[in-house]
């Protein structure tokens, strides 16, 4: 039993490496690791990662040795990042709380700002902003949702650091 679990854990890590690590919840799971767990342990569909598109679905099917037909998408989306219209920002801090990678800085009742290099384009801040002062804009440096491994690793690292920090605050 432990050998089977060990193999499943290794497979889960490989799936996690294939996911873009946006932590965007578009797959309906709270984060990429939860989705990877669902694929391994609950036989979840492989096509639920919208940002990863067919590219990620194909990688995961190869990891699982599943011979599924993946509909290739030639469409390359602009890689968006969030932008705050600072004059309209009320400093509510909601965006700071929902950002999975701590890419937003600011204080209560003060203007907030996006750290462009850290923003992974998850759009969680956009949907939560109560005054609609945020928008997604193209990031010229990153022109596709198909993140290379280095960017995904940075996003995963920032997310894990936020989890550790927020867990310490709650204690």
Question: At which residue positions do the language-model features occur?
Answer:
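Aromatic-flanked redox-active Cys/Sec active sites in thiol-based oxidoreductases
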Residues: 21, 86, 101, 116, ...
